[in-house]
Structures are given as structure tokens and as C-alpha cells.
Amino acid sequence: ENYKAECRCCGNTRLECVVSLGNSPLANNLLNDENQEDELYPLQMNYCPKCHNVQLSHSVPREKMFNDYLYVSSTTEVFKTHFNDAARNLTRKFNLDENSFVVDIGSNDGIFLNPLKWKGVQVCGVEPAKNLAKLANDNGIPTVNGYFEDEETIEQIGIVVNGGHLIKQEADLVTAFNVFAHSDKLEQITRNVFKILKPEGQFVIEVQYLLDTLKDLTFDNIYHEHYNYWSVLSLSNFFKGLGLHITDVEHINTHGGSIRVFIGSQQLDVKPSVTEFLKSEKEFGLDKLETYKEFSRKVEKLKENSVSKIQSLKDEGKSIVGYGSPAKATTVLNYYGIDSDSIDYIIEDNEMKHGKLLPGVRIPIQGKNGQLDTNPPDNILVLAWNFFDYIKQNNEELVNRGCEFITLKD
């Protein structure tokens, strides 16, 4: 029922299946108890030979994933720093001041808008998860609870900012961090962005970078919330189709490699970075089917190696505890078939996840507690591998007691 036969970008119906990770539960829908059923959906990646977009074969209804969301950006110091830096960079680049108006799509708890508000910039967030929109509003960040592709959400943006008056203030900047992969209604979102932007305003997005995923084999970044896996090549084709232009691209380190892309309706001065990215993508082979088939073969090999490594640790009688329960943990553990027989429990810093179970593999999630001190495990498997160094440094006492910190990529 949820099968997507045509390309989300160009409508081409001749898509090629390049990676299949089997049936997997929704990555962030943690279970409250043992009796709760898992909802499984195919996790399969298709490549469009026409516009080179890489996308999931199935679309899970958005309400199942985003209405109540357990991922709070501000839980992680690394992300706080990232968004503070982003706010500083974009303030400088666009000369933002108290006369500027910035709208952030998928604003979570207001982590990016908060530093802008402190500088006096007028801000408004749009967040589909009720719990996060409430959190942001409680913290003084005006936030509309809704989906940006919906007309009624757009109508409310003016109201929130202008104290109940429907004076439409045009935005100088609209941002979307790690959102552009998360929607099946990209054309509608983009049209709405340019509806509320000033003519010379810019749309800035951050997305995980497909080239990094392929190069570093970070297949665990593939999950149902991410409908699309972007490159500058595929984004460029998508925006061109809407009469828009990419004016600049920057590489950033979040989520195992991402890109920050600047889009405008006028062909403002296009920076050399755009051509440079397109050139390196062509050299890597992002426009060739074989590149993706090769990725799939490497992922299968990685699975073989990782599963046998975990098995040999268990055969030696070693205990293993997981650290971090990001979405990628659901993907990798379900694909590998590593469950609570191998991993006793998962430690997690985000309190909203404590007492829940990782879906599919049903591994219990808990906070750092006495159990770690009284009975430290032989191995700590860092599932939030993009924070490996940060997690290891924060748990020096465990390292000193002989705990070995490992990842599934070692």
C-alpha cells in the first residue's frame, strides 16, 4: 500500500532497487513494554537513473513517525555547539539583526532559533511533534505545531510572530536542518518556503550527504523517516525543476557527513563550491547504477564481519552493553539480527527513552545507573558512533576499569 513506484523528484517510474535491509520497525518508535507489537515495513533503497535521486521504496504515513517525537536536539552538547555555530555563521552571512525574520522548519525544541532570538532576531519555528512544539513555546521560542507542507500551518506563521495580527511579514531566511530527507511532500514544502521568503531571501537546508554514506558505508543512516538520500547532483535537478538555483554548498561533519545547501529564486552569484561538489560527485560515480550496487555488496560484507565479531565475543563469555539508542541503532541491529541475547541493555542519556525497548530487537533502554558501577560489562558497543569520542571521554572511569569501547564498524 505504501510502495512508491515513481521518483519523488522527477516522477520517473523506472527505478532501480539498490539496497535492501529487510523488514524493519520504525526507528524512533520505541516500545513501552514487551506486549507491544512491532510495526514492520520494508527498508529498501531505490535509485533513479534519470535525476539520480536515491530514495526509499516505501512511504510510511508521517503521522506514525512525527506526531510525538522522542528525539530532542538539545540532549547532545555536540548538537548544541553545531547549531550555535550555524546561527553565528548564518547571522554573519545574511547580516541578520532585529529587523530580520527567520523561520526554521522542523525546529525541534528551538535549538537553532534560540541563539538567534538572544541576538534580537525575530524568529518562528514550525514543528510537527506536539511535545516538542510545546517545549519550544514554553521556552519562549514562538513555534507553530504543524507540517510545513500544509496551507493552514503557513497561515499561522504570520499570526504567531505578529501577536495575533495577520500582517504577513516576509522571511529573510528559511532554514531546514535534517528535514529535507524527512518529507514526501518536497515540492509543496519548497513552494511554501518561497511563498513566505522575500524575493532576495534564501532557503538553507542541511541534509546527510549521500557521497559520505556510500564512501563510509554508513548504511545505518537509512531508515523510514529518511525518504530521500541527497547529493548536490540530485538536489540541483530537483530545484532546477522548480525554477530555483543552488547558490552555495558547504560540507559539515554532523550525522557522519552532511551538506549545507543555499537555494535562491534569483540566480544570485553562484559560488564555485557548487561546481566543485558536482565534479567530485561525478568522479565518485553518483550518476552510475554500478556505484550503488557496489555499496550494497560492501554493506552485506560488513554485516557478515560484524555479526561474527559479536558472536565470537559471546562465545568467549564476554558481556556487551550498548550505548546510545539513535535511529541508526534500530536499523543496524535489526538488519544484523543482534538482539537482547547478545546485548544486555542500552545506556541512553535522553531520559524520555528510559524504560522503553528498542523496537524489533527488544533491547531494554535505561539511564546510567548503579548497575554499570557494580557490574561493568566487558564491552560497550557505541551505537551512537558519531559521538564515539565524546561518549568515551565522558566515561573514563569505565575505560579505567577495563571496559572496551567498540563500534560495529571496527
Specify the residue positions occupied by each region the protein language model found.
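N-terminal juxtadomain amphipathic helix
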Residues: 1-78, 250
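Conserved class I S-adenosyl-L-methionine
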Residues: 98-108, 320-323
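Conserved SAM-binding loop of SAM-dependent methyltransferases across substrates and taxa
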Residues: 109-120
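A conserved beta-strand element that flanks and buttresses the S-adenosyl-L-methionine
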Residues: 172-175
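A short glycine-rich, Lys/Arg-flanked "PGG" loop and its adjoining helix->strand segment in the class I
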Residues: 187-202
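Conserved beta-strand signature within the Rossmann-like core of class I S-adenosyl-L-methionine
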Residues: 200-208, 404-407
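Short, glycine-/aromatic-enriched active-site segment of Class I SAM-dependent methyltransferases
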Residues: 205-228, 232-234, 239
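Flexible, glycine-/basic-rich loop-and-beta segments that form/coincide
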Residues: 255-299
